[in-house]
Amino acid sequence: MPEGPEIRRAADNLEAAIKGKPLTDVWFAFPQLKTYQSQLIGQHVTHVETRGKALLTHFSNDLTLYSHNQLYGVWRVVDTGEEPQTTRVLRVKLQTADKTILLYSASDIEMLRPEQLTTHPFLQRVGPDVLDPNLTPEVVKERLLSPRFRNRQFAGLLLDQAFLAGLGNYLRVEILWQVGLTGNHKAKDLNAAQLDALAHALLDIPRFSYATRGLVDENKHHGALFRFKVFHRDGEPCERCGSIIEKTTLSSRPFYWCPGCQH
């Protein structure tokens, strides 16, 4: 599943394609959304917001399209009039004079009014987004030590979108390697230096992944700036200590770690 950096880059691509341009055609696959098609013709996208792995497309008439790609959803940008050859099922089409954005295969799609943005179940539950520039290590540290999260093992906590939105499996293993901790650690057991390092890594690594513009299915992000240190590198030597990276399963997801320097 794409993680926060990949979702934010998708939002950037959608904004670059149609932001501020009048919509000339709108189509929704789901019957409950059909009534909004005519309401959006002539309107424009004001901005595209991410909340972890959810995407909010805001329109000039104050409506907001909520979509969560889950495992299979994908957005594509095409020239208007182009019909991509794909076996995926089209769910949403937002067309302007020159560019069209298409959402395929997603099933979690809703249209929200302003007052619903604060009451939507997912948006209520999701924690602060790691890519939000206003989120600071101090706030992250407070969340780590809060009664709700301080007793949780990091293996599960770092996948919980209620803790911090936008984290996922590759970020989980890279963050824990960076700070030399395992998935079994808990915030309550860390000393001040460990806690500070973790709070910074929880923001720095996702932001580095996003800023250096890479692809999750390559072994690097945006050129050679971000490299996986442990993710999908089981059997290889750790670049920090030389021990062999191992793979196990934690919280039902593959977990990669170095037994030599994560303890």
UniProtKB/Swiss-Prot annotation:
Sorted alphabetically, which keywords does the UniProt record give?
DNA damage, DNA repair, DNA-binding, Glycosidase, Hydrolase, Lyase, Metal-binding, Multifunctional enzyme, Zinc, Zinc-finger
Q: Which InterPro entries does the entry link to?
A: DNA_glyclase/AP_lyase_DNA-bd (IPR015886), DNA_glyclase_Znf_dom_DNA_BS (IPR015887), EcNei-like_N (IPR044091), Endonuclease-VIII (IPR023713), FPG_cat (IPR012319), MutM-like_N-ter (IPR035937), Ribosomal_uS13-like_H2TH (IPR010979), Znf_DNA_glyclase/AP_lyase (IPR000214)
Q: Which domain of life is it from?
A: Bacteria
Q: Which cofactor does it need?
A: Zn(2+)
Q: Where does DNA bind?
A: 70, 125, 169
ZnF segments: FPG-type: 229-263
Q: Which residues form the active site?
A: 2 (schiff-base intermediate with dna), 3 (proton donor), 53 (proton donor), 253 (proton donor)
The Swiss-Prot or TrEMBL record annotates one GO molecular function as: damaged DNA binding
- Any binding details for the cofactor? Binds 1 zinc ion per subunit.
The enzyme's E.C. designation: 3.2.2.-, 4.2.99.18
Recorded catalytic activity of this chain's protein: 2'-deoxyribonucleotide-(2'-deoxyribose 5'-phosphate)-2'-deoxyribonucleotide-DNA = a 3'-end 2'-deoxyribonucleotide-(2,3-dehydro-2,3-deoxyribose 5'-phosphate)-DNA + a 5'-end 5'-phospho-2'-deoxyribonucleoside-DNA + H(+)
Concerning PROSITE patterns, the annotation shows: FPG_CAT, ZF_FPG_1, ZF_FPG_2
Which BP terms from GO are recorded?
base-excision repair
Name the SMART domains on file: Fapy_DNA_glyco (SM00898), H2TH (SM01232)
Query: Which Gene3D superfamilies does the entry mention?
Result: 1.10.8.50, MutM-like, N-terminal (3.20.190.10)
Q: What does this protein do?
A: Involved in base excision repair of DNA damaged by oxidation or by mutagenic agents. Acts as a DNA glycosylase that recognizes and removes damaged bases. Has a preference for oxidized pyrimidines, such as thymine glycol, 5,6-dihydrouracil and 5,6-dihydrothymine. Has AP (apurinic/apyrimidinic) lyase activity and introduces nicks in the DNA strand. Cleaves the DNA backbone by beta-delta elimination to generate a single-strand break at the site of the removed base with both 3'- and 5'-phosphates.
> Member of which family?
Belongs to the FPG family.
Q: What HAMAP family does the record tag this protein with?
A: Endonuclease_8
* Protein name, per record: Endonuclease 8
Q: Which organism is it from?
A: Shigella sonnei (strain Ss046)
